[in-house]
Amino acid sequence: MGQQTLIYSFVARGTVILAEYTEYTGNFSSIASQCLRKLPASNNRFTYNCDDHTFNFLVDNGFTYCVVATESASRQLPIAFLERIKDDFSKRYSGGKATTATPKSLSKDFGPKLKEQMKYCVDHPEEIGKFSKVKAQVSEVKGVMMQNIEKVLDRGEKIELLVDKTENLRSQV
């Protein structure tokens, strides 16, 4: 893989690691497992720093995607990697094997995919940067749209109140 940027990754259901991949030796797998047990079950992203490494987690619909990266790696790289393996894993196993798989039973099948995605993300940082920018822009637009929808709903409620008050005034006349 050339430079040691993305070191270890896994996919878990709850606290059960279903597939993992690394080319390196170290205690990062045990630290990542400890972090996994402490993660909230809610859909979210989490990053922990330990011994010059970041332990990056993406929790989504009962599955946890993890990658350990060197602290020198850009913040976008691990996040983009997690999104890519989440999409890949979901397409490959949605509603199937993953819900009943035993510990590490998918490593033989999905481990090479983790390796491939790690290599791709490290070898194509410019594309990953573009992907992250577009994703950030989409999130920003989504936030603005949600605010606009809330304002429209508030206005709708205010209009209903005005209509009710007008009806009350008419009935009093």
Model segments located where?
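Soluble N-terminal interaction domains of secretory/endomembrane membrane proteins
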Residues: M1-D154, E160-D164, S171
